[in-house]
Protein backbone atom coordinates (compact mmCIF):
# COMPACT_ATOMS: atom_id res chain seq x y z
CA UNK A 1 0.00 0.00 0.00
CA UNK A 2 1.28 3.45 -0.90
CA UNK A 3 0.30 6.71 0.72
CA UNK A 4 0.93 9.88 -1.25
CA UNK A 5 0.82 13.04 0.83
CA UNK A 6 0.88 16.55 -0.60
CA UNK A 7 1.97 18.91 2.22
CA UNK A 8 0.37 21.92 0.52
CA UNK A 9 -2.98 20.11 0.52
CA UNK A 10 -2.63 19.46 4.24
CA UNK A 11 -2.00 23.17 4.79
CA UNK A 12 -5.16 23.96 2.83
CA UNK A 13 -7.15 21.39 4.79
CA UNK A 14 -5.86 22.86 8.03
CA UNK A 15 -6.98 26.34 6.99
CA UNK A 16 -10.41 24.98 6.08
CA UNK A 17 -10.70 23.25 9.46
CA UNK A 18 -9.72 26.48 11.23
CA UNK A 19 -12.39 28.38 9.28
CA UNK A 20 -15.07 25.83 10.14
CA UNK A 21 -13.95 25.90 13.78
CA UNK A 22 -14.30 29.69 13.91
CA UNK A 23 -17.75 29.61 12.30
CA UNK A 24 -18.91 26.84 14.62
CA UNK A 25 -17.59 28.65 17.69
CA UNK A 26 -19.42 31.82 16.64
CA UNK A 27 -22.66 29.91 16.05
CA UNK A 28 -22.44 28.23 19.45
CA UNK A 29 -21.64 31.54 21.16
CA UNK A 30 -24.67 33.16 19.55
CA UNK A 31 -26.99 30.28 20.49
CA UNK A 32 -25.69 29.65 24.02
CA UNK A 33 -27.86 32.22 25.84
CA UNK A 34 -31.01 30.80 24.24
CA UNK A 35 -30.06 27.20 24.96
CA UNK A 36 -28.95 27.65 28.56
CA UNK A 37 -31.69 29.97 29.82
CA UNK A 38 -35.19 28.52 29.66
CA UNK A 39 -37.95 30.78 30.93
CA UNK A 40 -40.82 28.97 32.65
CA UNK A 41 -44.14 29.37 30.84
CA UNK A 42 -45.97 29.80 34.13
CA UNK A 43 -45.35 30.57 37.77
CA UNK A 44 -46.48 27.17 39.06
CA UNK A 45 -43.90 24.86 40.60
CA UNK A 46 -44.02 22.30 37.76
CA UNK A 47 -43.23 24.94 35.13
CA UNK A 48 -40.43 26.40 37.23
CA UNK A 49 -38.89 22.97 37.97
CA UNK A 50 -39.05 21.94 34.32
CA UNK A 51 -37.51 25.23 33.20
CA UNK A 52 -34.67 24.74 35.69
CA UNK A 53 -34.08 21.17 34.46
CA UNK A 54 -34.08 22.29 30.82
CA UNK A 55 -31.66 25.09 31.69
CA UNK A 56 -29.31 22.59 33.33
CA UNK A 57 -29.45 20.32 30.28
CA UNK A 58 -28.93 23.33 28.02
CA UNK A 59 -25.87 24.39 30.02
CA UNK A 60 -24.47 20.87 29.72
CA UNK A 61 -25.06 20.98 25.97
CA UNK A 62 -23.25 24.31 25.70
CA UNK A 63 -20.28 22.90 27.63
CA UNK A 64 -20.09 19.78 25.44
CA UNK A 65 -20.40 21.87 22.28
CA UNK A 66 -17.49 24.03 23.44
CA UNK A 67 -15.41 20.90 24.01
CA UNK A 68 -16.29 19.69 20.52
CA UNK A 69 -15.22 22.99 18.97
CA UNK A 70 -11.98 22.86 20.96
CA UNK A 71 -11.26 19.32 19.73
CA UNK A 72 -11.96 20.35 16.14
CA UNK A 73 -9.49 23.22 16.54
CA UNK A 74 -6.84 20.83 17.86
CA UNK A 75 -7.44 18.59 14.86
CA UNK A 76 -6.75 21.50 12.52
CA UNK A 77 -3.48 22.20 14.32
CA UNK A 78 -2.56 18.52 14.03
CA UNK A 79 -3.19 18.52 10.28
CA UNK A 80 -1.01 21.63 9.90
CA UNK A 81 1.78 20.06 11.96
CA UNK A 82 1.61 16.90 9.86
CA UNK A 83 1.89 18.91 6.66
CA UNK A 84 4.90 20.82 8.00
CA UNK A 85 6.53 17.57 9.08
CA UNK A 86 6.03 16.00 5.64
CA UNK A 87 7.40 19.12 3.93
CA UNK A 88 10.48 19.17 6.17
CA UNK A 89 11.19 15.48 5.60
CA UNK A 90 10.70 15.88 1.86
CA UNK A 91 13.19 18.75 1.84
CA UNK A 92 15.73 16.69 3.80
CA UNK A 93 15.29 13.75 1.44
CA UNK A 94 15.69 15.97 -1.62
CA UNK A 95 18.79 17.58 -0.13
CA UNK A 96 20.35 14.19 0.57
CA UNK A 97 19.83 13.12 -3.04
CA UNK A 98 21.18 16.40 -4.41
CA UNK A 99 24.28 16.45 -2.21
CA UNK A 100 24.98 12.75 -2.80
CA UNK A 101 24.88 13.08 -6.57
CA UNK A 102 27.39 15.92 -6.84
From Swiss-Prot:
Compartmental location: Secreted; Cell envelope; Cell surface
UniProt KW NAD keyword: no
UniProt GO cellular component terms: cell envelope; cell surface; extracellular region
InterPro entries for this protein: PE-PGRS_N
Record Pfam families: PE (PF00934)
Described function: May play a pivotal role in the evasion of host immune response by M.tuberculosis. Mediates production of IL-10 via activation of the p38 and ERK1/2 mitogen-activated protein kinase (MAPK) signaling pathways.
Official protein name in the record: PE family immunomodulator PE15
Chain's gene name: PE15
